[in-house]
């Protein structure tokens, strides 16, 4: 084997290894699913950006307490020269530069109110981030447990299909021995075709659930996922709290009321005087004045004088609103109506949140009872199927009875899968409803 062949084989081996590595499934626990969903969620990133913006708004509002420092410079070249009472004012290359400091002294409380509003906005953004985080976790949990449930249904139908394959082989042998009829074999084949149809539908559903989970955790859509938290543990729910004080929605409504009160103060500030202080210094130069002057004895001689100098300025301004056709009072009344609406929203949604948490508690309790009922039904279906298999093998039960027992087992297994999955989803919904997620 020459060197070229060795290089080609090495390249093929490396490509094979990379292909195997790319096909490795993603093993995912519920905790890992949550972490990846939080890290990938665009909505959560947008809420986090909104919080950063609110923090900057608060920092911006702080600067309103501080003096503003500005600098300016102006240059001018004016033609022709200006005539001023027989003299010429020349401004060719005239310049002026200055600095100015402005400090608000009293603004009717607008600056303080604006700072409080900015702080409320920051707190609102924090609660909005919490609410978005909860929504992401609820979506991740639902997708995770649904994916597990559909996978279990696939395995259940595959087991059911294997049972029908075994029964089909047994019936073929019985038909050859004259102990079964063609109708028995046709009924089994029909049932097996129906199971194949159901299995295909569930497999398609499982693939869609996998792609949905890939979207949530930020994985490629062709990534195979192996869920590791497949053991369902359901303990009897006791001591479930109906407290809603930790709900971010409730906090958002409270912040809305607080903001409404500040808006009233802001509207009232328009009726109050404002006081400001301004201090500055300016320097100008290259300003020339030309004219004629009496040199004595009636002799007029030309003269010119250039000016360059600096000057300071201190100014205190007071603005008092006197008459604006009731504009400010109407703004105050409007802000009061908005505050009233915010208080009504709080009353309404507090009742709705209480109903929601009560429903969540009821769902958890009912979900646990459904699991117990489904487990009992599955035990009975298992025993019934075992008995019917033995009786059918001993020719003491008809094929119809055996097929019915298998259908009952399938339904009981499906009921248990759905009950366990729904219970896990109800647990997450309860945590969200109480603000503990």
Describe each PLM feature range.
Residues 1-31, 38-41, 423, 437:
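Bacterial Sec-dependent N-terminal signal peptides
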Residues 22-68, 74, 221, 227-263, ...:
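Bacterial Sec-pathway N-terminal export signals of envelope proteins
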Residues 23-25, 72-103, 230-234, 278-320:
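Small/polar, glycine/serine/threonine/aspartate-rich low-complexity segments that form flexible
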Residues 28, 135-248, 363, 367, ...:
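Periplasmic alpha-helical coiled-coil/stalk elements that build and connect Gram-negative outer-membrane
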Residues 43, 68-70, 110, 201, ...:
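Membrane-spanning beta-strand positions in outer-membrane beta-barrel proteins
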Residues 45-49, 62-63, 105-133, 183, ...:
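Sec/SRP-type N-terminal targeting helices
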Residues 194-219, 378-436:
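Short segments within alpha-helical structural elements
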């Amino acid at each position: 084997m020459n060197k070229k062949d060795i290089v080609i084989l090495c390249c093929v081996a490396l490509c094979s290894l990379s292909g195997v590595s790319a096909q490795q499934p993603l093993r995912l626990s519920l905790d890992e699913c949550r972490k990846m969903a939080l890290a990938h969620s665009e909505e959560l990133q947008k809420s986090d950006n909104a919080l950063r913006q609110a923090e900057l708004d608060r920092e911006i509002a702080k600067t309103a307490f501080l003096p503003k420092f500005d600098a300016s410079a102006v240059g001018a070249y004016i033609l022709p020269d200006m005539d001023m009472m027989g003299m010429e004012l020349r401004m060719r290359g005239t310049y002026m530069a200055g600095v100015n400091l402005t400090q608000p002294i009293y603004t009717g409380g607008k600056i303080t109110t604006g700072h409080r509003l900015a702080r409320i906005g920051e707190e609102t953004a924090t609660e909005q981030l919490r609410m978005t985080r909860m929504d992401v976790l609820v979506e991740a949990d639902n997708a995770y447990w649904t994916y597990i449930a559909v996978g279990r249904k696939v395995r259940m139908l595959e087991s059911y299909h294997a049972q029908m394959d075994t029964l089909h082989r047994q019936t073929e042998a019985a038909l050859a021995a004259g102990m079964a009829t063609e109708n028995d074999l046709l009924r089994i084949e029909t049932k097996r075709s129906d199971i194949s149809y159901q299995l295909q539908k569930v497999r398609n559903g499982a693939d869609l659930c996998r792609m949905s989970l890939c979207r949530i955790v930020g994985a490629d859509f062709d990534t195979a996922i192996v869920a590791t938290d497949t053991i369902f543990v359901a303990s009897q729910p006791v001591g479930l709290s109906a407290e809603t004080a930790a709900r971010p929605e409730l906090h958002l409504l409270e912040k809305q009321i607080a903001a409404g009160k500040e808006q009233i103060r802001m509207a009232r500030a328009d009726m109050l005087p404002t006081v400001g202080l301004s201090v500055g210094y300016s320097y100008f130069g290259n300003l020339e004045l030309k004219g004629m002057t009496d040199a004595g004895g009636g002799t007029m001689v030309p003269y010119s004088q250039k000016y360059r100098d600096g000057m300071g300025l201190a100014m205190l301004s007071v603005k008092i609103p006197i008459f604006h056709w009731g504009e400010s009072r109407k703004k105050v009344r409007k802000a009061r109506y908005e505050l009233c609406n915010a208080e009504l929203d709080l009353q309404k949604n507090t009742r709705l949140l209480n109903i929601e948490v009560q429903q969540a508690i009821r769902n958890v309790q009912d979900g646990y009872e459904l699991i117990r009922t489904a487990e009992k039904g599955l035990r009975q279906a298992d025993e019934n199927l075992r008995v019917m298999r033995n009786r059918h093998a001993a020719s003491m039960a008809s094929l119809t009875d055996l097929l019915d027992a298998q259908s009952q087992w399938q339904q009981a297994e499906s009921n248990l899968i759905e009950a366990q999955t729904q219970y896990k989803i109800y647990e997450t919904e309860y945590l969200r409803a109480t603000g503990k997620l």
